[in-house]
Amino acid sequence: MKIHFVGIGGIGMSALALHEFFSGNEVYGSNIEETERTTYLKKLKIPVFIPHSEENWFDPDVLVKTPAVHEDNPEIIRARKENVPVENRLSYFKVILKRENREEFAVTGTDGKTTTTAMIAHVLKELNRSPTAFLGGIMDSLEHGNYESGKGPVVYELDESEETFSEFSPNYLIITNARGDHLENYANSISRYRAAFERISRNSDLVITFAEDELTSHLGNVTFGVRKGMYTLEMRSASRSGQRAIIEKNRKRYAELKLRIPGFHNILNALAVTALFDSLGYDLEEVLKALERFPGVRRRFSISYHDPENNIYVVDDYAHTPEEIKNLLQTAKEVFENEKVVVIFQPHRYSRLEREDGNFARALQLADEVIVTEVYDAFEEKRPNVSGKIIWDSLMNLGKEAKFVDDLSRLNSVIVPRDNTVFLFVGAGDIIHYSKKFVETLQSSTNSPSRVSGSKR
C-alpha cells in the first residue's frame, strides 16, 4: 500500500510513518518545514517534500493528515479531487491497531503523557517483552527515538486534544490527569470533556487514575497519588544525581522507587507505572530496577549545555501548560539550589493562552527572571488582543522581573549570559532553535569579559 502523510515531520505523524514503512508499505510525505524528524526520515530513504504542494503526489492509496492541516491544504484538495481516502491521524492509528491486534498499553491526560508512555515502553523492553512503541517525544533508547518495532505489546500515548481519542480500546490505560486543556475542541464544555474520558475508561480492562484529579479519579480500577489512592508516597529525597521515594500500597510500606531523572512529577509518573505493572502481576523488583535505569525523554528537563568553570546551564523543556511549567520550575529550584533561574518562555497556541488567563504568570513567578516571547501559533489563527504580552503584564503586576520579546530574531540579544545561572528554554513550539543559538553564543564567548558575574542565591 502507498501512504501519503501530510505533516510527516510532526512527532506523532512521523511515528506512524515509521511503523508503516517498517511494515513494508510505500511511505512518503510532506511538511511545512524541515524538522529533526524529517531529517531522520530522509536518512531512512523515506521521501519528504518541503513545503506542501499539489505536486507532492504519487497516486497514494490513502492520505493521512495531522490535525494541524486544514481542508485548504493543496494536497488535501488534490486527494479529494482524485477520490483518495483522507484519514485523520487518530482514525488511521486505529486502523493500525486493529491490524496489529495485540495487547495495548496507553497513556492519556493533560500532563506527563510522553514521559509515562516512555517509562512503560522502557520497562517492557527491559523485561524482554519486545514492545512496539509510539512516543510523543524522543527517547534515545528507542531504536528510532519516537518509535520502535517489536513483536510484543503496543505502547502508545493518546492525545486528548482530539475528542476521538475516546474511541480507542486499550487493554490497559493510565490517565495522568485532566485539566481541561484543549477545551475548545469540546465546544468549551467540561461535561463533554469529562464524558470522553469516561468513554475510553469503559473501553479498557484496567484503568489507572490519579486519585487527586477532580475529573477522572473515579474512573480508575486502581488509583495512585501523593496521599490519596491505593498506591501512595510515604517520603521522598532528591539530589542532582536522582531521587528516591517509599511507595505505600493500601497504607502499608511496599517498595522503594528510585529514578535517575529529577522532578516530583516524575516520581508520580513512575508511581502510576508501578501501579500498572504491579496490578498486572509483573515482578515488582524487576519493574523497579527497570525504572531506576529509565533514561528520560529529550526536551524534558534536558541539559543541553554546561559550563562548569562559570557554572552556567542551559536546559530545554517542552512544558507548555501552567501545571507543567510549575512542575518544571519546582524541579529547577530543587536541582539548582544555588543558581539563579532564568526562564525564556514561548506560549503555545492562542486558544490555550486565552483560556488559561493568569495561570501562566502564576506558574512562571517561581523563576528569578522571566523572558516571554510572542505566541507560537501551532497553525491557529491569531486572536484579537491575545499575545504573549498578556503574560508579561500579569508578571509585572505580580512584581516579577520580566521582559517581553515580540520579535524572536531579537531574543538572543535580550538574554544576558551570566555566571551561576540556569537558562530554561520552555515551550512546545520552536523555542528549541533559539536555545541552540544561545548555546552557540555561550560557546563562542566562554572567555569573554562581557559575561555578567552573578552571585549565588
Swiss-Prot record:
Instruction: Cite the Pfam families for this sequence.
Output: Mur_ligase, Mur_ligase_C, Mur_ligase_M
Task: Give UniProt keywords alphabetically.
Answer: ATP-binding, Cell cycle, Cell division, Cell shape, Cell wall biogenesis/degradation, Cytoplasm, Ligase, Nucleotide-binding, Peptidoglycan synthesis
> Where does this protein chiefly localize?
cytoplasm
Any one GO cellular component localisation term in the record: cytoplasm
Which Gene Ontology BP terms does the record give?
cell division; cell wall organization; peptidoglycan biosynthetic process; regulation of cell shape
Annotated binding of ATP, by residue? 109-115
Pathway participation: Cell wall biogenesis; peptidoglycan biosynthesis
List its EC numbers. Answer: 6.3.2.8
Reactions catalysed, semicolon-separated, are: UDP-N-acetyl-alpha-D-muramate + L-alanine + ATP = UDP-N-acetyl-alpha-D-muramoyl-L-alanine + ADP + phosphate + H(+)
Keyword Transcription attached: no
The main enzyme category here is ligase
- Transmembrane domains' residue ranges: none
Family of this protein:
Belongs to the MurCDEF family.
The record's section on PANTHER family has: UDP-N-ACETYLMURAMATE--L-ALANINE LIGASE (PTHR43445:SF3), UDP-N-ACETYLMURAMATE--L-ALANINE LIGASE-RELATED (PTHR43445)
Q: What is this protein called?
A: UDP-N-acetylmuramate--L-alanine ligase
Taxonomy-wise, where does this protein's organism fall, top ranks first? Bacteria, Thermotogati, Thermotogota, Thermotogae, Thermotogales
